[in-house]
């Protein structure tokens, strides 16, 4: 491959050169949403983070199988395997079938992801569609001696596993810390110790979502689904497993334990985790009740919002921070992102207005190299964006006559902006934003202004003024130049 990509491996706590197990093929699994409510800003971050990774790996020439699951069963209210299934609870409260809840919110999630220009994964498996695979996983762990049956449920024996392996190697915890911080909850008497986690839960009589198993009717534990589905679609060993850093413990720690217990080693080579979106320093999330949904951002309908923000503003806002850095929500930060995005899109539009010269005194090759170097450095999107802003200054200086650019360099500059703005960062011009409207109305405005040029040549000042005044009233700024005209749509 042309580029040497390094990524931060949470397991080893350092940046490592990315070397696929079976190049040019790459297997990537990312934990998707539990679909019992509308997607919020916290859901957007992992989706955008791993969308950029998917795009970049594809750009580097890899053939990526990207699996992003849908959790539609087994995610209980508490990590200690207690409480009601989140989807079943929503269904009970709204007097719906659980799969009605799943389908409704999954449709809305897909719509929000499409608005954010997040590419669909190669495969989007549902936990409820892979019960057989999860039962087989539980059987293997039982056969290996790292699980036990208790009153119709099956639990992973963390203490026994820890004697032979290292439970806590991903999160940096040791078993004593886990035991000391595990809450004693009702129903824990089924477990040998409070740190044990459910592989299969017995269904109470009132529990709607249930399947037959060798241990009686029940449902899979939350952690089992990703191990089972990752193995089914990516094999016993694959390259990347991603998700939010809030999943490191217990979810991903438990996945490693399940993998090692069932097949003897870890399935995953690189573990990647994005940091959190916060509001006033507190993690944004459904369980905390402090979230703002993506639809509320797009409409401006939440009380904390001073205005609506377009999907591309949200995407740009997230990409302005490195994926491993926290991002704190504020209207000021989003408004700054909105202005920055507008500057970048104006630069892209201005590329079409440049007339090439015979020679160049700008360094396009260096700009391209710097952008790739930033992406190769653990997907450093904020540095890529800063280089693109340098490119925007280059464009403005060329238009102002301070620099010149040859036809070949202009072609390369257009390619740099298209590759990084659109193909890799996944930005797009939006109909409804000023940039999107410029793209949509461009030919019509150009045609009208060409008529105005003809009117002026014929000294038809009334028609010339009428066209200018009408376009100005619609928000277009018209500038006469020696070559004809320039225009832009003001916000």
Curated annotation (Swiss-Prot):
Q: Per the UniProt entry, what is one GO biological process?
A: cysteinyl-tRNA aminoacylation
Top-level division of the source organism's lineage: Bacteria
Co-factor: note? Binds 1 zinc ion per subunit.
InterPro entries with a match to the protein in the record: Cys-tRNA-ligase, Cys-tRNA-synt_Ia_DALR, Cys-tRNA/MSH_ligase, CysS_C, Rossmann-like_a/b/a_fold, tRNA-synt_1_cat_dom, tRNAsynth_Ia_anticodon-bd
Catalysed reaction(s) here are: tRNA(Cys) + L-cysteine + ATP = L-cysteinyl-tRNA(Cys) + AMP + diphosphate
Q: Pfam families annotated for this entry?
A: CysS_C, DALR_2, tRNA-synt_1e
Q: Mind naming one GO cellular-component term on file for this protein?
A: cytosol
**UniProt main location, coarse:** cytoplasm
Q: Under which EC number(s) is this enzyme classified? A: 6.1.1.16
State its location(s).
Cytoplasm
Q: Which residues bind Zn(2+)?
A: 31, 226, 251, 255
Amino-acid positions noted as binding ATP in the UniProt annotation, renumbered to this chain: 286
Q: Identify the residue span(s) of motif 'KMSKS' region.
A: 283-287
User: Annotated motif 'HIGH' region: location in the chain?
Assistant: 33-43
Q: Which UniProt keywords apply?
A: Aminoacyl-tRNA synthetase, ATP-binding, Cytoplasm, Ligase, Metal-binding, Nucleotide-binding, Protein biosynthesis, Zinc
**PANTHER family, from UniProt?**
CYSTEINE--TRNA LIGASE, CYTOPLASMIC, CYSTEINYL-TRNA SYNTHETASE
Under the subunit heading, UniProt states:
Monomer.
Q: What is this protein called?
A: Cysteine--tRNA ligase
Q: What is the lineage of its organism?
A: Bacteria, Pseudomonadati, Bacteroidota, Bacteroidia, Bacteroidales
Gene that this polypeptide is encoded by: cysS
């Amino acid at each position: 491959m042309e580029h040497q990509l390094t990524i931060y491996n949470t397991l080893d706590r350092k940046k490592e050169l990315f070397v696929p197990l079976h190049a040019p093929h790459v297997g990537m699994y990312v934990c998707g949403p539990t679909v019992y409510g509308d997607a919020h800003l916290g859901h957007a971050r992992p989706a955008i983070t791993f969308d950029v990774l998917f795009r970049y790996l594809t750009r580097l020439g890899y053939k990526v199988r990207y699996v992003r699951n849908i959790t539609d069963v087994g995610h209980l209210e508490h990590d200690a395997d207690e409480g009601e299934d989140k989807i079943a609870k929503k269904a009970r409260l709204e007097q719906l079938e659980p799969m009605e809840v799943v389908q409704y919110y999954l449709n809305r999630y897909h719509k929000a992801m499409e608005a954010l220009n997040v590419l669909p994964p190669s495969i989007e498996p549902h936990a409820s569609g892979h019960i057989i695979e999860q039962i087989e996983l539980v059987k293997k762990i039982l056969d290996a001696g790292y699980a036990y049956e208790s009153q119709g449920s099956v639990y992973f024996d963390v203490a026994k596993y820890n004697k032979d392996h290292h439970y806590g190697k991903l999160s940096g915890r040791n078993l004593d810390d886990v035991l000391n911080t595990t809450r004693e909850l009702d129903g824990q008497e089924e477990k040998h110790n409070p740190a044990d986690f459910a592989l299969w839960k017995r269904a109470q009589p009132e529990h709607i979502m249930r399947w037959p198993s060798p241990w009686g009717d029940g449902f899979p534990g939350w952690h089992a689904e990703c191990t089972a589905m990752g193995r089914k679609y990516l094999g016993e060993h694959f390259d990347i497993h991603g998700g939010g850093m809030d999943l490191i413990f217990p979810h991903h720690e438990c996945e490693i334990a399940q993998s090692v217990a069932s097949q003897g080693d870890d399935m995953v080579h690189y573990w990647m985790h994005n940091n959190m979106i916060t509001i006033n320093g507190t993690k944004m999330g459904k369980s905390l009740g402090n979230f703002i949904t993506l639809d509320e951002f797009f409409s401006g309908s939440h009380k904390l919002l001073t205005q609506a923000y377009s999907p591309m503003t949200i995407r740009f806002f997230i990409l302005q921070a490195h994926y491993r850095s926290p991002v704190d929500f504020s209207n000021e930060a989003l408004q700054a992102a909105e202005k920055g995005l507008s500057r970048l899109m104006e630069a892209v539009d201005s590329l079409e207005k440049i007339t090439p010269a015979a020679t160049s005194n700008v360094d396009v090759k260096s700009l391209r190299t710097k952008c790739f170097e930033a992406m190769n450095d653990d997907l450093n999107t904020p540095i890529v964006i800063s280089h693109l802003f340098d490119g925007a200054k280059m464009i403005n200086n060329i238009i102002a006559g301070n620099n010149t650019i040859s036809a070949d360099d202009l072609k390369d500059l257009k390619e740099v902006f298209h590759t990084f703005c659109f193909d890799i960062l996944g930005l797009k011009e939006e109909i409804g934003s000023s940039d999107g409207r410029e793209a949509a109305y461009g030919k019509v405005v150009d045609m009208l202004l060409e008529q105005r040029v003809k009117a002026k040549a014929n000294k038809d000042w009334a028609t010339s003024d009428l066209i200018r005044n009408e376009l100005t009233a619609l928000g277009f700024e018209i500038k006469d130049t020696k070559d004809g005209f320039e225009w832009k749509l003001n916000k």
